[in-house]
């Protein structure tokens, strides 16, 4: 199947993977921070934006479809659910993923004893809003992320414009992605990956707690972890320059 992709810039290949319920347009305001140094590919995951749905939507089939669509090798940046897709792709095709940035992402989304994450009940409450009224839940989610930012209104207008330009995700894709968030456990995959890995976390993130950085560092030898002050779950939108600089520096050192 052919997934919808957009490519811009020149230089080493970078692939951006969006999160649950979104599409590649979410990166539009962030891409210019990268294209002076990198050739950036954005993709709509199956059933999101302009990409068709997969008959069998699973972490493995989605990662496989993305691998078929993007340049190889590339430095992958996975945001939220996109981090899980990137981890699975790195497991399936190590030579295709030169390095991996987990951007407010985690190998295990749901909290467990000794593992920071979102409580399962909270995740289901959050997801129910998107499943019952996607547009309203999306507005509320983005407003929460932008709250308190100096350019709050401008930021919200820009992001809403970027998201409204493509169809909303298909319900089966939302449900399948939710199952991945609830049940996937890629900690063993992360532990064994040969590629360089960094984690970028926001101190105001209410979905992926900033405390995860310490757990990731214990899990993966050599993992680089950065905490972005005042950043919510979307630091590439609220702190684009800082996020891009950390990606630049990490890739340069990989």
Swiss-Prot record:
EC primary class: hydrolase
Binding site for substrate: 20, 80-81, 141-145, 233
Keyword Protease: no
Keywords: Biotin biosynthesis, Cytoplasm, Hydrolase, Serine esterase
A GO CC term attached to the entry: membrane
Enzyme Commission number(s): 3.1.1.85
Xref: InterPro entries: AB_hydrolase_1 (IPR000073), AB_hydrolase_fold (IPR029058), AB_hydrolase_sf (IPR050266), BioH (IPR010076)
Catalytic activities: 6-carboxyhexanoyl-[ACP] methyl ester + H2O = 6-carboxyhexanoyl-[ACP] + methanol + H(+)
NCBIfam families on file: bioH
Subunit relationships: Monomer.
Family statement drawn from the similarity comment of this UniProt entry: Belongs to the AB hydrolase superfamily. Carboxylesterase BioH family.
Task performed by this protein: The physiological role of BioH is to remove the methyl group introduced by BioC when the pimeloyl moiety is complete. It allows to synthesize pimeloyl-ACP via the fatty acid synthetic pathway through the hydrolysis of the ester bonds of pimeloyl-ACP esters.
Annotated protein name in UniProt: Pimeloyl-[acyl-carrier protein] methyl ester esterase
Organism this protein belongs to: Methylococcus capsulatus (strain ATCC 33009 / NCIMB 11132 / Bath)
